[in-house]
Amino acid sequence: MEHPSTNYTPEQQHEKLKYYVLIPKHLWSYIKYGTHVRYYTTQNVFRVGGFVLQNPYEAVIKNEVKTAIRLQNSFNTKAKGHVTWAVPYDNISKLYAKPDAIMLTIQENVEKALHALNQNVLTLASKIR
């Protein structure tokens, strides 16, 4: 059973994707358990996604085995309304993941190093002139 989609404006979609990173398709299978993801379907429908339960996941859909990502809406399996669902990779056009603290720290450090490198290039360029 497919969940009815909520329609989000482009502005709402942009806001919901704040702090999320677009993951290249060849890296989808590396998204680990517990990561929160959002995605666009191949029909360009925005989905708010869920937490990764299994990835990759071999799902049987209409008697066909497909590589999928299995998601859940919470970690409390006993909570009212807890659901899991599988989304085949070939039904996803764009997949976004929320980075964890380690990745955010690495990104921050790379940005600082790049800024310092750019400053060094500017200093060298001014001395050459």
UniProtKB/Swiss-Prot annotation:
Write the signal peptide boundaries: none
- Keyword Heme listed? The answer is no
Quote the subcellular location field of this record: Virion
Q: Which GO terms describe its biological process?
A: symbiont-mediated suppression of host innate immune response; symbiont-mediated suppression of host type I interferon-mediated signaling pathway
Q: What is its main location?
A: virion
Instruction: Tell me one GO molecular function of this protein.
Output: hydrolase activity
A GO-annotated cellular component: virion component
Q: What keywords would UniProt list here?
A: Host-virus interaction, Hydrolase, Inhibition of host innate immune response by virus, Inhibition of host interferon signaling pathway by virus, Interferon antiviral system evasion, Viral immunoevasion, Virion
EC identifiers of the protein: 3.1.4.-
Family as reported in the entry's similarity comment: Belongs to the asfivirus C129R family.
What does the protein in this record do? Plays a role in the inhibition of type I interferon signaling pathway. Mechanistically, specifically interacts with 2',3'-cGAMP and cleaves it via its phosphodiesterase activity. In turn, prevents 2',3'-cGAMP interaction with host ER-resident STING1 leading to inhibition of downstream signaling pathway and type I interferon production.
What name does this protein carry? Uncharacterized protein C129R
Species source reads African swine fever virus (strain Badajoz 1971 Vero-adapted) (Ba71V)
